C-alpha cells in the first residue's frame, strides 16, 4: 500500500473514531465484553476496512442490530493436535469456529510420527483458506523417544525444509527434556536452528538446576 493511501486511511479512521464520518460497518447496541477491565459495556462498535475504530455511539453505511447480544474477542487455542480429533482440518474448523475459536496453534507431532514431513505438509495444505487461522509448530520429537517405533524420524535438517513456511511459528513441545539437559547433539541442533523462533516446552517433572538447564536451552513456554 502506498504511503499516501495509508495517510488517507488514517485520516478516515480518525474522523470515524471522532464520529465526524460514517463507519463502513457498525454493530449496534451490543453488550461488549471488555477483557481488559472485566466489564460489560453497552454500545456500538464501529468498523472501517476490517479494523475496529471506535466503541460508543456510531452510525454506519451498514448497520447490524445486535439487540443486546454479546460481542467479544474470538478465542485462540495456543496448543492443539488436530489429528487427535480424527477429522480433517476443514471438519475441525466447522466444529470450533461456531464456538468462537478463530485461531489455533497446531503441533502435528502425531501425524508426523506416522507420515513424517508429508504429514506436516498435509496439515499446512489442508488448512489453507479455511475460516480458521491455523499456525503450526514443527514437531521437535519424532519419535518422542528412541524406544518407540515410528513411521518417521525428523532431524534438524528435515525441519529446516519447512521452518520458513509462512504459517510456521517455531519448534513444537520439546518432550525430550533429558536430551536438552544432557546436551544431546541432535536436540541441540534443533534448538540452535530455532533460536530465533518460539520453542515450546514439555517438562512436567523437571525442577531445580535441571530446570535451569532446560530453560537456558531456549525453551519459551511450558506445556503443563
Q: Model features per residue range: what roles?
A:
Residues 2-16, 93-200:
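Divalent-metal coordination cores built from histidine and acidic residues
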Residues 4-74:
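Histidine-rich, glycine-flanked metal-binding segment
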Residues 30, 50, 68, 79, ...:
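Divalent metal-coordination and catalytic microenvironments
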Residues 34-38, 85, 150-152:
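Short loop/turn motifs at secondary-structure junctions and domain boundaries
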Residues 69-92:
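Di-metal (Zn2+ and/or Mg2+/Mn2+) metal-binding site signature of metallo-dependent hydrolases
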Residues 76-83, 171, 200-202, 223:
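Histidine-centered divalent metal-coordination motifs
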Residues 185-193, 199-224:
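Functional cores that coordinate and move charged inorganic groups
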